[in-house]
Every structure is written in C-alpha cells, then in structure tokens.
Amino acid sequence: MSQVDKTARRQKIKARSRAVVRGTQERPRLCVFRSLSQIYAQLIDDESGKTLMAASSMSKENAGLTGTKSEVSAAIGKQIAEKALAQGISRVVFDRNGFRYHGRIKALADGAREAGLIF
C-alpha cells in the first residue's frame, strides 16, 4: 500500500470518527497526532472550537525526554493528563485521529490513564 493510499485511508477513518466523537468543555476531546518521529496531544472543546491545552514531544519542556518513541509517548500522555487534572478536567473523549490503537497511540492513552484521566 503506497503512502498516498495510507494517508487517504486514515483521512476517511478520521472523518467517520469525527462525525461521532465530539468534545465539550466538561469532557473535551483528547486528539492525538503521530508523525514519524514526534507525537502531539491536544484537549479540544468542539462546541467553542478552542484548544484547551496541548503537549508534544517537540515542546521546550520535553526537550530532555529520552528513550524509545513509545516511552516518550507515554510521558506525553502523563503530561497532558496532569495538565488536564490541574484545570479540573478528569473525563475526556479519546480521538485516535484515524490511527490504529497500537504502539505509540496506545502508549499515550495508557500514560494518560495511569495519570488519572478517565476515558
């Protein structure tokens, strides 16, 4: 399967899931994006169209993270969960953004659950 086909397939899956998954102020959407070397997570309120908070492996505060990409993803999950709990958000809707729930996506979700997010 070529890269174009994989990207188009992921976009179709993303569109189908976004028709169902909606974030609110009380229960925002935890949206995950995975590139070849980095991972990004955002808490999004779809009602107002605003990003409430974000964490990524590219940010300055995470410049010292070392280990495998899965270990870094788990650390990003814990970090976004700690930020959310500090703002009083304990429940989220997980949006895997068309990616398979496997590897780094699963590691991020497990890290967020360990830190106290419920989804």
UniProtKB/Swiss-Prot annotation:
Which UniProt keywords are listed?
Ribonucleoprotein, Ribosomal protein, RNA-binding, rRNA-binding
The parts of the chain that form a coiled coil are none
Citing just one GO molecular function, the answer is: 5S rRNA binding
* Gene Ontology terms describing biological process: translation
The record's family statement is: Belongs to the universal ribosomal protein uL18 family.
Q: What is this protein called?
A: Large ribosomal subunit protein uL18
Entry-linked Gene3D superfamilies: 3.30.420.100
Its biological purpose is as follows: This is one of the proteins that bind and probably mediate the attachment of the 5S RNA into the large ribosomal subunit, where it forms part of the central protuberance.
Under the heading Pfam families, the entry gives: Ribosomal_L18p
Give a GO cellular-component term: cytosolic large ribosomal subunit
Record note on quaternary structure? Part of the 50S ribosomal subunit; part of the 5S rRNA/L5/L18/L25 subcomplex. Contacts the 5S and 23S rRNAs.
